[in-house]
């Protein structure tokens, strides 16, 4: 799982690095101009979409049904245990505050 995260992280860094190299050759606008803000916003949005698409593609390539079922089962068991322990903790806290 960590290798997938690292791959996606380096992909995002690579895309951002190419943008920085390409942005150096562009004409410099006034820093306060709305056109520059729009360009930056559009650029960030396009990078986010690219990274999201790459992550989704990577997930679809490495999707394993058995692992997904195990993760869902582990999540349901752990959330049930946490709700039980949260109930016990709440009970103890109310008892402590009430002073019985």
Swiss-Prot record:
Residues 1-22 form the signal peptide. It comes from the Eukaryota. Residues 66-74 are annotated as: Lipid binding. GO terms for molecular function: lipase inhibitor activity; lipid binding; lipoprotein lipase activator activity; phospholipase activator activity; phospholipase binding. Residues 78-100 are annotated as: Lipoprotein lipase cofactor. Gene3D superfamilies: Apolipoprotein C-II. This is Apolipoprotein C-II. It comes from Cricetulus griseus (Chinese hamster). The gene is APOC2.
């Amino acid at each position: 799982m960590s290798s997938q995260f690292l791959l996606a992280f380096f992909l995002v860094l690579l895309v951002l690095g190419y943008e920085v190299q390409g942005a150096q050759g562009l004409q410099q606008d006034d820093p306060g101009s709305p056109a520059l803000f729009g360009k930056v916003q559009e650029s960030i949005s396009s990078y986010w979409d690219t990274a999201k698409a790459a992550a989704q593609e990577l997930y679809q390539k490495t999707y394993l049904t058995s692992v997904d079922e195990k993760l869902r089962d582990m999540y349901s068991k752990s959330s049930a245990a946490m709700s039980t322990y949260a109930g016990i903790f709440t009970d103890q806290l109310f008892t402590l505050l009430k002073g019985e």
